[in-house]
């Protein structure tokens, strides 16, 4: 039964491989080097601003302190349980 099912799959895969690459799609428009660099620079500046804003929000929030406290408390509880059981 396995051979019966795997042979058609093998035939389809071989046909796909032997068919070769598909027809070429339209060539993308050539961008000027300067406009491409300007777009890349603008993207980099935008990304930099967003990352700075994100890190500033994280620094100003109390999430890191709360997370650190939660981990400390949980670790302390685990240590206490291990001391009691051993």
Swiss-Prot record:
One of its GO terms (biological process) is negative regulation of lipid catabolic process. It comes from the Eukaryota. Residues 1-26 form the signal peptide. InterPro entries: ApoC-1_sf, ApoC-I. One of its GO terms (cellular component) is very-low-density lipoprotein particle. It is found in: Secreted. Its main location: secreted. Inhibitor of lipoprotein binding to the low density lipoprotein (LDL) receptor, LDL receptor-related protein, and very low density lipoprotein (VLDL) receptor. Associates with high density lipoproteins (HDL) and the triacylglycerol-rich lipoproteins in the plasma and makes up about 10% of the protein of the VLDL and 2% of that of HDL. Appears to interfere directly with fatty acid uptake and is also the major plasma inhibitor of cholesteryl ester transfer protein (CETP). Binds free fatty acids and reduces their intracellular esterification. Apolipoprotein C-I is present in acidic (APOC1A) and basic (APOC1B) forms in P.paniscus, P.abelii and P.troglodytes and perhaps also in baboons and macaques. The two genes for ApoC-I arose through a duplication process that occurred after the divergence of New World monkeys from the human lineage. In human, the acidic form has become a pseudogene sometime between the divergence of bonobos and chimpanzees from the human lineage and the appearance of the Denisovans. Pseudogenization resulted when the codon for the penultimate amino acid in the signal sequence was changed to a stop codon. Belongs to the apolipoprotein C1 family. PANTHER family: APOLIPOPROTEIN C-I (PTHR16565:SF2). This is Apolipoprotein C-I. It comes from Ateles geoffroyi. The lineage of its organism: Eukaryota, Metazoa, Chordata, Craniata, Vertebrata. The gene is APOC1.
